[in-house]
């Protein structure tokens, strides 16, 4: 493959930003999502998973798919945008990036709609058997996203660029668009408008949930706690969308136009810089998604609280020195209360 003209702009700060940021996301994301899977396996028998827990489990799997490719991107940006790995791994990384992004959007959307039904039609929702629907919707989402992402797996994903330092050529991964390519533009227009259509539906559902919860009279303290958690859940889902997905899709279309040669100069450089930042924000959904689970399931919160207090308790074990000078560990429950006061 011959090197192409170096007409495209570059944002060189990304070669420092992405390795650091993606490393943090990788560590936090793997820990958080692996813990979620462990809790699901330990607390919830597979046959007792209801619709929303099925969606949560699938969302976790989508996040882990993206996380396993982060080391590939870390290596890529560490080498200043030079893909030194086998070409098929570039295709795989791009494929999993697409699957994670739009599976996450889809599963957050159906989770929101599930909560919308629970608030607006509580009796009907409580009586409905939703396990089969959860499995069916999950299969539809996965099949649709994998089918769409297969395009990136067969695409010629790499291209050769001349290094700006003149030290040789760089192999780029998913960083080349043919000037004026209308198919590429149409695909991006479809993705961006589809996202904002889904976002508007989610925004509407969440606003209805908030209004309904705020207008309900609270007669018991327990109900007040349930309402508080429900409101936090709504705010968390909206925060994930606004922080992670909205900035990327706002920038995506003008960035595509600039990459295709419809815009140039200072605008192209500015929008390319902004695009790199939105890619970082997009990856944070892998860390933020597990927070939603804390507000959605009672058992998950209980298990997390028990582990947290268990760790605190083990750290607070009192060390008492006997008269003989031998140090022994005494459980906290057996230490007099007055001895713990400092």
Swiss-Prot record:
Tissues and organs where the protein is expressed, per its UniProt entry: Differentially expressed in the lung, heart, liver, skeletal muscle, kidney, spleen, small intestine, endometrium and white blood cells. Expression levels are higher in the endometrium of pregnant compared to non-pregnant individuals. Endometrial and embryonic expression levels increase from day 10 to day 16 of pregnancy.
Any Gene Ontology biological process: G protein-coupled receptor signaling pathway
GO CC, alphabetical: membrane; plasma membrane
Membrane side Cytoplasmic: residue ranges: 39-54, 114-133, 206-233, 297-342
MF (Gene Ontology): G protein-coupled purinergic nucleotide receptor activity; platelet activating factor receptor activity
Disulfide bonds: 90-173
Record's keyword annotation contains Transmembrane: yes
UniProt keywords, alphabetically: Cell membrane, Chemotaxis, Disulfide bond, G-protein coupled receptor, Glycoprotein, Membrane, Receptor, Transducer, Transmembrane, Transmembrane helix
Positions of transmembrane segments: 17-38, 55-74, 92-113, 134-155, 185-205, 234-254, 277-296
Extracellular topological intervals: 1-16, 75-91, 156-184, 255-276
InterPro entries: GPCR_Rhodpsn (IPR000276), GPCR_Rhodpsn_7TM (IPR017452), PAF_rcpt (IPR002282)
Transmembrane helix in keyword set: yes
Membrane topology type: Multi-pass membrane protein
Subcellular locations according to the entry: Cell membrane
Residue positions the entry lists as glycosylated: 4, 169
Any one Pfam family match given in the protein's UniProt record, by short name: 7tm_1
PROSITE patterns cross-referenced by the UniProt entry: G_PROTEIN_RECEP_F1_1, G_PROTEIN_RECEP_F1_2
Major localization class: membrane
Protein's job: Receptor for platelet activating factor, a chemotactic phospholipid mediator that possesses potent inflammatory, smooth-muscle contractile and hypotensive activity. Seems to mediate its action via a G protein that activates a phosphatidylinositol-calcium second messenger system. May have a role in peri-implantation development during pregnancy.
Family from the record: Belongs to the G-protein coupled receptor 1 family.
Assembly and interaction partners: Interacts with ARRB1.
Protein name stated in the entry: Platelet-activating factor receptor
Source species: Sus scrofa
Gene responsible for this protein: PTAFR
């Amino acid at each position: 493959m011959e090197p192409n003209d170096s007409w495209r702009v570059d944002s060189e700060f990304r070669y420092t930003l992405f390795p650091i940021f993606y490393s943090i996301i990788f560590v936090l994301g793997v820990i958080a999502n692996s813990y979620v899977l462990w809790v699901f396996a330990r607390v919830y028998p597979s046959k007792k998973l209801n619709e929303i827990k099925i969606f949560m489990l699938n969302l976790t799997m989508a996040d882990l798919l993206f996380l396993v490719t982060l080391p590939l991107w870390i290596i890529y940006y560490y080498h200043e945008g030079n893909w030194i790995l086998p070409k098929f791994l570039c295709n795989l990384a791009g494929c999993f990036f697409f699957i994670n992004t739009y599976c996450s959007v889809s599963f957050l959307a159906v989770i929101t709609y599930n909560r919308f039904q629970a608030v607006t039609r509580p009796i009907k929702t409580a009586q409905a058997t939703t396990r089969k629907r959860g499995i069916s919707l999950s299969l539809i989402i996965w099949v649709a996203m994998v089918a769409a992402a297969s395009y990136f797996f067969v695409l010629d994903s790499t291209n050769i660029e001349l290094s700006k330092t003149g030290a040789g050529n760089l192999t780029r991964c998913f960083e080349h668009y043919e000037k004026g390519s209308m198919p590429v533009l149409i695909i991006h227009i479809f993705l961006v408008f589809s996202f904002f259509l889904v976002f508007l539906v989610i925004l509407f559902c969440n606003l209805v949930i908030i209004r309904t919860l705020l207008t309900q009279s609270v007669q018991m303290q327990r109900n007040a706690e349930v309402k508080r958690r429900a409101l936090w859940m709504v705010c968390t889902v909206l925060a994930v969308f606004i922080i992670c997905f909205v900035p990327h899709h706002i920038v995506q279309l003008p960035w595509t136009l600039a990459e295709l040669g419809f815009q140039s100069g200072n605008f192209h450089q500015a929008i390319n810089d902004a695009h790199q930042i939105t890619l970082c924000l997009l990856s944070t959904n892998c860390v933020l998604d597990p927070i939603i689970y804390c507000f959605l399931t009672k058992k998950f919160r209980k298990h997390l609280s028990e582990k947290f207090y268990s760790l605190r308790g083990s750290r607070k074990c009192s060390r008492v020195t006997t008269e003989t000078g031998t140090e022994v560990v005494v459980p906290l429950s057996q230490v007099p209360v007055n001895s713990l006061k400092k």
